[in-house]
Amino acid sequence: MMHPSRQAYVEDAEPQGIALEDIPDDHDYDISMGGTGVPSEKASAVLNQLNRKRLAATIAVPTDDTRVRAKLREMGEPVTLFGEALVDRRDRLRELLTIQAELNGLENGDITMDDAEDDQEEDQEQEFYTAGGPQLLEARLNMVEYSLPRAKKRTQFQKAESTIPLRTQVKFRKQVKERLQAFELQGSQTVGERHVSMTRISPNGEMVAVGNWGGQVKLVEIPSLNQKMNFRGHTNKISGLSWFPGATLPEQNVSPDTVNLASGGAEGAIHLWSLNQDTPLSSLEGHSQRVCRVEFHPSGRYLASASDDTSWRLWDVETTAEVLLQEGHSRGVYAVSFNTDGSLLASAGLDSIGRIWDLRSGRTIMILDGHLDGHIKPIHALDWSSDGHRVLSGSADGWIKCWDIRKVQRTGGIGAHTSAVSDMRWYKGLDDPLTGIPPGVDEKGAQLPKKSGSFFISSGFDKNVKVFSADDWTLVQTLSGHTGPVASVDYSRDGKWIVSGGHDRTVKLWGRNDGEGI
């Protein structure tokens, strides 16, 4: 070790640099300019990119791919690109929204998806009430008095029906299917120069009311398909027909001189017809646009109508007065249907949403909608089951879906047609517990199953009429014969006939070769 006296002396240098706490804050982000005093293109591009990233980070983009697709469709952009993943699609939407924000001169991402949709939903969900008159109060009380005894009668039969062994039910339904599978084309008749738009079979099964695009309503005999009567009154397309409950049935004492049939037209008029004159007995006026469907209440005292003016209305048949104007749809209402009790009404239309209304209180008790459950295109048809708590909806998306108001959810769905579903009818036969004579018991005292409610029929723009089982939702029969889209379909209560009409201007009659029903 070297002695300190021998070590070389080195003078300490003065401290160099600056302490961290003494470093000044620099808020000047200007990039130094070139010799000409103009920022370089590269520096400008970097600044623009940083600003765009900062703006993009402030824009809220949904994580749900369905909402991402919907927003892209709304902006007129391709919903999906070849090989594009979910994350890529979301990033593409963010980029488009960023560009839109830049064009609008927004710096803080004011056009957020969440804010815009929340505002829209608040507008749509805003609830308001309209005071009803004494006629509406009377109508609601009448429906309470009418529906409660019917509901009691229906549930009593359902309790008895629940005792039927499953094995017996399966065997009985199999027999019904076998008889339906034997249905064939039995007749065809051209009934006008324009497309057939609506067909409805009379309660006695001996006539069918036919409406066409020319505004004509005709009565055609079954099974001959000869024209019996031509009603004159409409000036535009017939889009709704409904028979008065019990009309043409001798035991119901409905006179041919009184109201037997109702029709709705594209000119906005509703006409009530007797069977003894070719001009309307009376007309119901109030809709400002096309009347899409009409249907009598099971009591026959009221008539419901659906219209393109986004409302459905309830009319008093005796006084021809408008009892209720009900809003609730954002677009035209295309279909209405009463349940068998007469307490509920289903409505649906071009907004792809259905609603179940309690006629006794005026409240909506169920909405036929949902991300996975609802329809993605307009709903064209509605019909209730004879059990009173299930309703079918048919849509332009080709699907028929079943909704249970007790569970408040969808309970079944069928990809019924390759094109739009135009019409649909759930079979209610002569053995229906409310509209007919329910089946009794066998020799051992066991309850017999009923045919009513065992199947339903549908028509579509794929030129077919189809028959489906209503328990396992399987296809029973496809009736092909129309050369154009089929616009309407109906059945006879005795199960002998199915009638359809379409754009080929014909009415076609389907049945078994032996002339027997199901």
Language-model region placement:
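WD40 beta-propeller repeat fold
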Residues: E161-G328, A335-S337, I367-G374, D383, ...
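A positional/structural detector of protein chain ends, strongest at the extreme C-terminus
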Residues: P4, D514-I518
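Intrinsically disordered terminal extensions that flank WD40 beta-propeller domains
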Residues: M1-R194
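Conserved "HGTGT" condensation-loop signature of ketosynthase/thiolase-family condensing enzymes
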Residues: G495
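Hydrophobic, structured segments
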Residues: D341-S343, D351-Q409, A420, D431-T435, ...
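Adenine-nucleotide cofactor-binding loop residues
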Residues: N276, E318, R360, R406, ...
